[in-house]
């Protein structure tokens, strides 16, 4: 009797377990929902031709810097007075005024169209390719426009003889009338005339200064000889 009762209990238990396994399994209350599977990332796009050209230009510039053919860009704040010590403060101010005059967009840059208008007003109009070539020659950050530093670099290269005589940048530098009255040069029409006259004035001043120093040395030598002669004469009287 006991064995039959035990067998019935086992049979009911097996049926209950089978029913639980075959039915839908509900998530317990309060259990966190399963996280959604992340979607696969789209494949990376192949580099475009413009990206290849930009990378090539950057590598080319790095080679120029390593070989000393180009100035490395500085991360610090640009200071024209320390970076271009050959220019006086007045000259830099005049060049800055000229830069702002043609910076019609007031964004701190002279773009292609603004450079086109500048060259037309200076009486040396350039073709579209000529304008792009002008910018490219001093465009150190490859942004296709001129910053104030790159604008000053034009005059630095011109003064150092690094520009072609028939280039657009040379025409810009020659035709830019800069007030250099406080450079110690009166009546100079442009930067190059000012540099020549400034060098002449400096040479003349150095010559006058050297002549004064030589005259002072000669007078001191004559005074020393007179004192020596007086001491000798005095010694003769005492003997």
Swiss-Prot record:
Q: Tell me, what is an example of a GO biological process annotation in this record?
A: regulation of cellular hyperosmotic salinity response
Where is region (Disordered) located? 1-53
Domain of life, per the record?
Eukaryota
Q: Which UniProt keywords apply?
A: Calcium, Membrane, Metal-binding, Mitochondrion, Mitochondrion inner membrane, Phosphoprotein, Repeat
Every copy of the EF-hand domain together lies at 90-125, 126-161
Q: Where is this protein localized, as stated in its record?
A: Mitochondrion inner membrane
- Coiled-coil residues are none
Task: State a single Pfam family of this protein.
Answer: EF-hand_7
**Binding sites annotated in the UniProt record for Ca(2+) 1:** 103, 107, 114
Bias-annotated ranges (Basic and acidic residues): 1-18
GO cellular component: a single term: mitochondrial inner membrane
A molecular function GO annotation? calcium ion sensor activity
Q: Which residues carry this modification: Phosphoserine?
A: 201
Annotated residues for binding of Ca(2+) 2 = 139, 141, 143, 145, 150
**Where does it primarily localize?**
mitochondrion
The record's function comment reads: Acts as a calcium sensor for mitochondrial flash (mitoflash) activation, an event characterized by stochastic bursts of superoxide production. May play a role in neuronal differentiation.
Entry protein name: EF-hand domain-containing protein D1
Phylogenetic lineage? Eukaryota, Metazoa, Chordata, Craniata, Vertebrata
């Amino acid at each position: 009797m006991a064995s039959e009762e035990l067998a019935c209990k086992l049979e009911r238990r097996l049926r209950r377990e089978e029913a639980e396994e075959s039915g839908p399994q509900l998530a317990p209350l309060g259990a966190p929902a399963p996280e959604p599977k992340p979607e696969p990332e789209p494949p990376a796009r192949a580099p475009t031709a413009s990206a290849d050209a930009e990378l090539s230009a950057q590598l080319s510039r790095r080679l120029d810097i390593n070989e000393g053919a180009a100035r490395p860009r500085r991360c610090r704040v640009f200071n024209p007075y320390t970076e271009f010590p050959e220019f006086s403060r007045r000259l830099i101010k005049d060049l800055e005024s000229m830069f702002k005059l043609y910076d019609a967009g007031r964004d701190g840059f002279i773009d292609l169209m603004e450079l086109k208008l500048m060259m037309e007003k200076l009486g040396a109009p350039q073709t579209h390719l000529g304008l792009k070539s002008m910018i490219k020659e001093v465009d150190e950050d490859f942004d296709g426009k001129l910053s104030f530093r790159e604008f000053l670099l034009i005059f630095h290269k011109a003064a150092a003889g690094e520009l072609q005589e028939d280039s657009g940048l040379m025409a810009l530098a020659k035709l830019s009338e800069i007030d250099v009255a406080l450079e110690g040069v009166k009546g100079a029409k442009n930067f190059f005339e000012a540099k020549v006259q400034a060098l002449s004035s400096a040479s003349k001043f150095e010559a006058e200064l050297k002549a004064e120093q030589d005259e002072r040395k000669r007078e001191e030598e004559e005074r020393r000889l007179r004192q020596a002669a007086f001491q000798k004469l005095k010694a003769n009287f005492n003997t």
